[in-house]
Amino acid sequence: MPQSRIPVEDPGPPACMRNDRMVEFSEGRVCSSLAKERSMNKVYPDANTALAGLLRDGMTIMSGGFGLCGIPEKLVATIRDSGVTGLTLISNNAGVDGAGLGLLLETRQVRKMVSSYVGENQLFADLYLKGELEIEFNPQGTLAERIRAGGAGIPAFFTKTGVGTLVAEGKEIRDFGGELYVMERSLVADLAVIHAWKADREGNLVYRKTARNFNPVMATAGRITVAEVENLVEPGTIDPDHIHTPGIFVDRIIHATALEKRIEQRTVRKRGN
């Protein structure tokens, strides 16, 4: 696999990668066991080293978050700095101008977006109208289920959402119990970059409030998953009943500090009211 263009030392591939290429599987994840090589310590010193050896032109990347909530901003910035191009991004939205996945749109590194709500990014609309960006729109629930199905190894499913609309054009329609359903194919990605509130060194993740959003399902649907976390603790510290994403789905972790809490929309009363 081509190396990242970031000038950093590659800490070495996980156990599921050999001879500088990813082992090919038709569906689902490559693997998630680093026990032999890293003694289950999946923590990398920074985003550069965590993504080293994983990035290439034309790859498909899932990015967690909803708006600017729960986005892996350090990892996204590192993808931008790597210079990879022709990317297909799977994300609920495209960030905003100057933040989130909007950074990758500004540098014209994205070829296609598989998304749901994109109305907050003016550049996104401009690129689409100029024919410089391919878009695959999805109802939001359908997008989430396509990702969940990909992580579960389910190749496709039927849903009533979108029947009789542009969403259903070119897709198989079937009758079940007198109701029409459209077939949707599942989604998997070469790489999933996600954000979590807390993790232990074995990759068990806890999300905080609405920042959970698309992160858990994307963790399962990436052939390689890299998590950006706010708090890092030792194994055994997190109550098993509180774990949202088990470590088996996480390959690499970075402890992200000095994160900026961005407010997408702020509405307050006028002074004196």
How does the language model describe each region?
Residues 34-273:
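Conserved alpha/beta enzyme-core scaffold
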